Amino acid sequence: MATSTLPQVPYKVGVVGYGRLGQSLVSRLLAQGSELGLELVFVWNRDPGRMAGSVPPALQLQDLTALEERHPDLVVEVAHPKIIHESGAQILRHANLLVGSPSALADQTTEQQLLEASKRWGHTVFVARGALWGSEDISRLDAAGGLQSLRVTMATHPDGFRLEGPLAAAHSSGPRTVLYEGPVRGLCPLAPRNSNTMAAAALAAPSLGFDRVIGVLVADLSLTDMHVVDVELLGPPGPSGRSFAVHTHRENPAQPGAVTGSATVTAFWHSLLGCCQLTSRPGIHLC
């Protein structure tokens, strides 16, 4: 259950990943943490040199397996799905986990490992909503048994993609090219850093999940400074037979070639604050 204020005793937070999103979170925690009842206890990055000159040496964690020594209450992952695959279950032994790369959960083995660790140690797997607009409404409709279909399209300039496998060799055939259209589970390993919005949608709608939520990835040469996310869902039919429908269109400003849009950074900060106000409970929960 949420409390009305952040904890009076400093709530200890560790950050895993020091890219654009990690840098923003660390900066805010250092500047505002004390007044919010939060204490940054470590920052880890695969390349430690990236932290030099900006993260106080005492906060730099060289070995992620030693995070227990910092006694975190919450570990925030903003690095890469590989961190969740490799270390997510171990992190849950010591702290709650805020997953910034939910595409990792498309791997069923990883999802099961996190669920088992969460139940064993009594810690929560939080998943940041990120760029997904309307996640609570999606969850409510799904819980009521009314969600019939869910489709998430993410479009941006090709320079904003970090693709793997067969998609890495994909080329735009015109000003707007559909690179992938199909189940989110199939997209996540091919575009692990560009499918997090779709993954969050799959988690918001467990009746459909990763296999029935449809993800569409579009390369659009005109979108040099933004990410565009369209969420389309169908609900139950009305008396006339016409189905309930929602379509949201979100334009998120972004630096050219950036993976993370500007509004997503702010949304993630609020997800972090929200996690700190919730009591630990086993399972995977959007935040």
From Swiss-Prot:
One of its GO terms (molecular function) is aspartate dehydrogenase activity. Pfam families: Asp_DH_C, NAD_binding_3. The keyword Coiled coil does not apply. GO terms for biological process: NAD biosynthetic process. The modification Phosphoserine is found at residues 24, 172. Signal peptide: none annotated. InterPro entries: Asp/hSer_DH_NAD-bd, Asp_DH, L-Asp_DH, NAD(P)-bd_dom_sf. It comes from the Eukaryota. Keywords: Phosphoprotein. Belongs to the L-aspartate dehydrogenase family. PANTHER family: ASPARTATE DEHYDROGENASE DOMAIN-CONTAINING PROTEIN (PTHR31873:SF6), L-ASPARTATE DEHYDROGENASE-RELATED (PTHR31873). This is Aspartate dehydrogenase domain-containing protein. It comes from Mus musculus. The gene is Aspdh.
